[in-house]
Regions:
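Short arginine-rich
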Residues: 95-98, 306
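Helix-centered, glycine/charged polyanion-binding patches within enzymatic domains
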Residues: 2-4, 11-15, 200, 205-278, ...
Length: 319
């Protein structure tokens, strides 16, 4: 983005201002995010309890649907598992639904390895994919304690890798990893989660290199890859590649002109999506171990997508 090339005076560059043109609709969508209307469909009640496995030994009582519902309510209302168990019991009692409610221990134990599929709106056009990552805290005190008492408390983070649909702003792929895992190494896993054609894939300079281009080409050969090359990058010695064409255009017209012509500026939408995730869900993971944290992150992405589908702002830049 342009301000990144003015690091010495970045603080003097004003932030771009935008005006919302559909404020009544967006205002109504924000209010619908807090709607407490709850119901159980006949299909949900029928699928609430797990079917018999046909094997000897203990049988599961609750289906994956029941566990996912409980964990989703926990994230939406920002409460511990015991309170979530109480909420589920209260909802079943008020609606007079005859279902067994999983206790907090079951919700925690079954959360690890729970298969979570993305809940997305149907699309007919090829996907314009935006990739980026952000950090989520697992434990550790905040900056307030450090500043007030001069302490350096230990912190631990997980890295959340997101793939965003640039048109609908839905999260179409997500993966949670330890914080020492490189962004490029997770790209194949994100691409494998996407069904359908991908028209373009845009990511920041951390993904620059043959690994990212090969990962995209192996799965979607016709996809345009938009990644800013490093300032020290040189053309390849073999057949001209997409990266070579980016380098040639930057050398001829400049990096800012390349950003405008390639559509690289759309990558800021995935940064906005990460801010939306942290605003709705929070900046901290509740689960303690990595398998449960991965389930939590995928359910959280579905929650964010559900709220995104209620309505999004349409903005125009104020000149």
């Amino acid at each position: 983005m342009p301000y990144k090339f003015n690091a010495s005076r970045r603080h003097k560059i004003p932030k771009a201002r935008y005006r919302v043109t559909n404020w009544p609709d967006y205002d109504a969508a924000l209010m619908r995010r807090g709607d407490l209307t709850v119901w159980f469909t006949e299909e949900a009640v029928a699928a609430w309890h797990a079917p018999a496995t046909g094997e000897r030994g203990g049988q599961p009582v609750y289906s994956s649907l029941a566990i996912e519902t409980g964990l989703a309510l926990r994230l939406v209302f920002h409460q511990p598992l015991r309170q979530t168990e109480g909420m589920l019991r209260s909802i079943a009692e008020v609606l007079n639904v005859d279902i067994a409610i999983p206790d907090h221990t079951t919700l925690s134990r079954r959360g690890g390895g729970l298969p979570i599929l993305p809940k997305l709106a149907a699309r007919n056009e090829p996907l314009h994919l935006l990739i980026d990552s952000t950090g989520l805290k697992t434990y550790g005190e905040g900056e307030w304690l450090d500043q007030q008492h001069g302490l350096r408390s230990r912190r631990r983070w997980r890295k959340l890798h997101l793939g965003l649909d640039a048109d609908t702003q839905e999260i179409v792929a997500a993966e949670l990893t330890p914080d020492d895992v490189g962004d490029v190494s997770v790209l194949p896993e994100l691409l494998d989660q996407i069904d359908g054609d991908v028209a373009s894939m845009t990511a920041d300079g951390a993904y620059d290199g043959e690994t990212a281009y090969s990962a995209v080409a192996d799965r979607h050969p016709a996809t345009a890859v938009v990644i800013p090359p490093r300032t020290t990058a040189v053309p390849s010695h073999t057949t001209t590649t997409q990266r070579d064409r980016h380098l040639a255009e930057i050398a001829e017209h400049g990096r800012l002109a390349w950003q405008r012509s390639s559509g690289y500026s759309r990558r800021s939408l995935v940064e906005t999506a990460m801010y939306r995730y942290k605003t709705i869900i929070g900046r901290r993971l509740h689960a303690r171990i990595l398998p449960n944290q991965r389930t939590e992150a995928k359910i959280a992405c579905n929650v964010v997508n559900r709220m995104t589908c209620l309505g999004m702002p349409v903005t125009v830049r104020v000149v």
